């Protein structure tokens, strides 16, 4: 990825508004090997359900924490997004969207316990995803005049909307599904399902965004975007609506002007409805969730960002009808968790040294087909 001169100024901005990473990270591991969080997205009382992760990857429910807002309700995948529930880079904060009340909630993370510390309007309708980089937080509002809105994050984990930070997407009701910062914080990418566009915004030194650079995805069905640590942008694509097992994943490099250059275009996932992806913290693998097939596929990430299928590509199989939505990986890159809306479980898979998956069980503490969206883990 080419570099631009604003990088150093952006780092200075992030440092000036950044919350205390070290002090909060110290309390983020007060119990268990880690934690997993899911969001019920209830239209009456949006809540986060937390689980303590043990060393063998199994989960024990730890608590329920109200966001102070309302979700959208629904049945299966009502938010149609990746990133409705997002951990900060150091796992000390958890951000949750309240799609029904148009707000974002911020929690301090103490192991598997949460403390609500802030809640702010998102500056738009139906927020469905959030991304964080240092002291910057951007929220995706999918309803009406679809937009992204920026906030600064101070030492007390309080949000403040950045003046003139609203950027509208290329169409109203864009069905935008995800947003992600590049690893160096220079770019924010947003996927639009209605147009099959990937919008790129350069992040300015004051935290606002530059003009929209519109990129057409090389494959149909652009849904979720995530970045590998080496800077490659990884896009999950559902594929043609009428095709069977036609979902794909593509990787791109982001050039200095915001245009995307394909690296691996349309690598088959051998499943249906690949809408979500997750990159392991060690940067070696990316996994995708084929919701309509109830399967997980995996790919190794090369030094150039090229994608290579791991083994037979389909590595994890949930029970038929699971409708696995969002997926998350533990901080040690040893376990993958899938939010299975169809049967009301969290699927648990062990990640082997070669990237293959082993099914090690499931947790049963969520309600089937009740509108759950969003999962995060460390």
Where are these regions (language model features)?
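Structural motif
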Residues: 45-49, 103, 147-149, 197-200, ...
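Residue position within the beta-strands of beta-propeller blades
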Residues: 38, 96, 139, 190, ...
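A short beta-strand motif characteristic of beta-propeller blades
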Residues: 62-76, 115-121, 162-169, 210-216, ...
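Short loop/turn segments immediately following beta-strands, especially the blade-tip
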Residues: 51-58, 107-113, 152-159, 201-208, ...
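Short loop/turn segments immediately following the C-termini of beta-strands
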Residues: 41-43, 53, 99, 142-144, ...
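Aromatic- and glycine-enriched pocket-lining scaffold segments that form the walls
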Residues: 138-206, 210-224
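Beta-rich, blade/repeat-based domains predominating
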Residues: 27-31, 68-90, 122-136, 167-187, ...
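Blade-level signature of beta-propeller repeat domains, shared across WD40, Kelch, NHL, RCC1
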Residues: 341-378
């Amino acid at each position: 990825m080419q570099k631009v001169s604003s990088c150093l100024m952006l780092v200075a901005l992030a440092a000036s508004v950044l919350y205390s990473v070290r002090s909060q990270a110290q309390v983020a591991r007060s119990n268990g090997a880690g934690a997993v969080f899911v969001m019920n997205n209830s239209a009456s009382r949006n809540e986060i359900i937390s689980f303590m992760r043990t060393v063998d990857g199994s989960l024990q429910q730890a608590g329920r924490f109200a966001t102070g807002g309302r979700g959208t309700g629904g049945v299966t995948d009502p938010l149609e997004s990746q990133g409705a529930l997002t951990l900060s880079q150091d796992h000390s904060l958890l951000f949750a969207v309240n799609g029904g009340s148009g707000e974002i909630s911020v929690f301090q993370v103490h192991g598997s316990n949460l403390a609500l510390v802030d809640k702010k309007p998102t500056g738009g309708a139906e927020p469905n995803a959030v991304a964080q980089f240092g002291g910057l937080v951007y929220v995706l509002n999918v309803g009406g005049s679809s937009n992204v809105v920026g906030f600064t994050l101070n030492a007390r984990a309080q949000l403040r909307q950045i003046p003139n930070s609203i950027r509208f997407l290329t169409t109203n009701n864009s069905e935008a599904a995800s947003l992600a910062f590049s690893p160096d914080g220079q770019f924010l990418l947003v996927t639009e399902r209605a147009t099959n566009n990937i919008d790129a915004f350069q992040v300015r030194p004051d935290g606002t965004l530059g003009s929209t650079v519109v990129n057409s995805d090389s494959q149909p069905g652009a849904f979720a975007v995530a970045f590998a640590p080496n800077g490659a942008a990884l896009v999950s694509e559902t594929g043609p609506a009428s095709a069977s097992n036609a979902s794909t994943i593509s990787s791109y490099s982001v050039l200095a002007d915001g245009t995307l250059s394909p690296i691996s275009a349309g690598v088959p996932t051998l499943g249906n409805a690949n809408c979500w992806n997750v990159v392991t913290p060690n940067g070696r693998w990316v996994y995708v969730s084929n919701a309509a097939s109830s399967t997980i596929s995996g790919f190794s990430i090369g030094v150039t960002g090229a994608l290579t299928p791991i083994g037979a590509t389909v590595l994890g199989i949930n029970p038929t009808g699971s409708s696995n939505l969002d997926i998350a990986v533990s901080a040690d890159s040893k376990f993958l968790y899938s939010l299975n809306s169809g049967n009301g479980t969290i699927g648990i898979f062990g990640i082997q040294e070669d990237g293959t998956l082993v099914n090690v069980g499931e947790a049963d503490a969520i309600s089937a087909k009740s509108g759950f969206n969003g999962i995060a883990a460390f």
